[in-house]
Amino acid sequence: MDIVGGQNLRQMWDDLAGVYGDKTALIFESCEGIVRQFSYASLNEEINRTANLFYSLGIRKGDRVALHLDNCPEFIFCWFGLAKIGAIMVPINARLLGEESAWILQNSQVSLLVTSAQFYPMYREIRQDNSTPLNHICLIGEQLPADDGVSHFTQLQARQSATLCYTPVLSTDDTAEILFTSGTTSRPKGVVITHYNLRFAGYYSAWQIALRDDDVYMTVMPAFHIDCQCTAAMPAFSAGSTFVLLEKYSARAFWDQVRKYQATVTECIPMMIRTLMVQPAAPTDRQHHLREVMFYLNLSEQEKDDFTERFGVRLLTSYGMTETIVGIIGDRPGDKRRWPSIGRVGFSYEAEIRDDQNRPLPAGEIGEICIKGIPGKTIFKEYYMQPEATAKALEPEGWLHTGDSGYQDEDGYFYFVDRRCNMIKRGGENVSCVELENIISAHPKIQDIVVVGIKDAIRDEAIKAFIVLNEGETLSEAEFFSFCENNMAKFKVPSFMEIRTDLPRNCSGKIIKKNLK
């Protein structure tokens, strides 16, 4: 089923501006409560000016530009401005530190970065490394440092024409984005996402929540994540709805913001639902216009029931990952929820449960969740410059191995059991155990290390490190956590540390993690 046709992202925005004109497309609220608002027509002009800005800086079709930004309208301008000229966005998780960010720049060969003043000192250090491909920074903010190779985004953009000046031939098969996501190896993989992927995501996710042009979709999810892009922004814009982007999540402010913008749809991760539930009950708890709340793993049935009862909303399950672009298994519009099922497979996809020999399993048996889609259209195209990793995850016929365990019932409803891959889910972020183990093992006092996820009432999982010290060494908790904080993003820092004399291993030498909690 081809629901996109040949319409690329440039055509999409030109059409949206023509159809919806002065209708509100984007509302942004900062942490300080400052609100910026754009109609479909004015947002398209901002996108065009940004595209012209990139062109003036030498960016052409196929070039890669990194964005290291918190939620802001400029992220939207850059995302689609790059797409309009056939360039490729490389969003960087705004919580990453220097070494992690530099690795992404190096491996995607980014020469231009758009970032804000708070992240600039980190990138000034990165640019001092002769091996970095980064040679220019476009800075969002009021004050511009007197450094070579730094431009002021706002000033440059304001001088550009609202009419696009560079219009190379575009195809829906062209790459629009490389989104680096954590994997089971020590380094992230770049998920290649096409124009078709993003257009399909808009239509598919709009169908999933029955989105209309009179809806208001509010999100606090970070714009550098696939969730914000493909289950919030793209469906909202594709349906002609109003997209409300908040800079940061605040449990105290959330429901006031829902009411302020008369949001009809939003999305939550379990951490948000749990923190909202611990807020004092108020007479206004049910005074809102929300009809759907998209949510993602993992919540207990009791937590779901308590949330829906208190706030009078429907929770709509959506299961997917960066590689699937959208929630390929989930609840459907109008369906009765079948907890604890994650729902049924969506249109344009197939799903199977397979055993370790890659054979389909019957209903009720646990195996790996595998999804069939069309690479570059309904699922990701490939891992950037990693053909072996692509071949391992993606079969030639389009079957994607998710690395997650689950089963299905006789009626075709799927149930998630556990993540097979070596990952920890922490407050909406995927954290690679191997990556943390490699970083921590560099400590001169540590001989052996393993990290595991343990249940956390607020953030899904907490991170615990089990370490074996070199003979005769001592290591305080303060020293350990200080080392971690200086070498990894804050959300990756373990919450707990335990020193052991050895680690349990099987006959092949692999650590038996189930014996460590």
UniProtKB/Swiss-Prot annotation:
Entry-linked PANTHER family: ACYL-COA SYNTHETASE, MEDIUM-CHAIN ACYL-COA LIGASE ACSF2, MITOCHONDRIAL
Gene designation per UniProt: caiC
Gene3D superfamilies listed in its UniProt record: 3.30.300.30, N-terminal domain of ligase-like
Pathway(s): Amine and polyamine metabolism; carnitine metabolism
Top-level lineage group: Bacteria
Lineage: Bacteria, Pseudomonadati, Pseudomonadota, Gammaproteobacteria, Enterobacterales
Family, similarity comment: Belongs to the ATP-dependent AMP-binding enzyme family.
HAMAP family according to UniProt: CaiC
Catalysis performed (reactions): 4-(trimethylamino)butanoate + ATP + CoA = 4-(trimethylamino)butanoyl-CoA + AMP + diphosphate; crotonobetaine + ATP + CoA = crotonobetainyl-CoA + AMP + diphosphate; (R)-carnitine + ATP + CoA = (R)-carnitinyl-CoA + AMP + diphosphate
Enzyme class name: ligase
Enzyme Commission number(s): 6.2.1.48
Organism encoding this protein: Salmonella heidelberg (strain SL476)
Keywords: Ligase
Stated name of the protein: Crotonobetaine/carnitine--CoA ligase
One Gene Ontology biological process: fatty acid metabolic process
